[in-house]
Amino acid sequence: TLNSYIVKGDKTAIIDGVIGWDGVSDTLYEHLEKNDIDPKAIDYLIVNHMEPDHSGWIKDFKNINDDFTIICTDKAAKLVHSFYDDDIDIRVVKEGDKLDLGNGKVLSFYPVPNVHWPDTMLTYEEESKVLFSCDMYGAFGMIKDHYFDDELTEEEVQLFEDEGIRYYSN
């Protein structure tokens, strides 16, 4: 996904951030404003992984709101500290840990390292039964006119696997 999500109880969380360039973060702030959400009132950033297309805006966000907590895995916490100031408030979560936002909104967290990125985790909102799957099921593009992997030739499967290995080895 390239989307960010808001979960609002008594407290407010953004799940998955955005890139920090090309005006994308401005678009996020515009959408927050349209939904009557003040960026200064956001309590939590749920960082499902630190890939730059989801975390590149954290520094910019910190200039707007310096009173929030990042929720992430231990691997992501190390990356947050290496990319940004050490004074960012971080809560490290493990499998099954919960964050109660109030008003029936409870998030639970499930690390799935290396499914997409070394620090990947999934976030589940219990009341609505929505799984925020990060980039776990995401894919960009397709090979020729094939939408499903059972339509691929052996050569196309090999190309897909080679590209996956190239991606992870970088």
Positions of PLM-derived features:
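Short coil/turn connectors at secondary-structure junctions
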Residues: 9-11, 42, 66-67, 86-88, ...
